[in-house]
Amino acid sequence: ARRRRRHASTKLKRRRRRRRHGKKSHK
């Protein structure tokens, strides 16, 4: 269970970064 909670936290952080926008900017 603890491992799952840690993964969820990482997912939330990744969503905040919005990699999709960064990729568009790179183009």
UniProtKB/Swiss-Prot annotation:
The protein's predominant localisation is nucleus
Can you quote a single GO CC term?
Answer: nucleus
Q: Where in the cell is it found?
A: Nucleus; Chromosome
Q: Where is this region: Disordered?
A: 1-27
Q: Which GO terms describe its biological process?
A: cell differentiation; chromosome condensation; spermatogenesis
GO molecular function, one example? DNA binding
Task: Cite the entry's keywords alphabetically.
Answer: Chromosome, Developmental protein, Differentiation, DNA condensation, DNA-binding, Nucleosome core, Nucleus, Spermatogenesis
Q: In which tissues is it expressed?
A: Testis.
Report the protein's function. Protamines substitute for histones in the chromatin of sperm during the haploid phase of spermatogenesis. They compact sperm DNA into a highly condensed, stable and inactive complex.
Q: What is this protein called?
A: Protamine-A
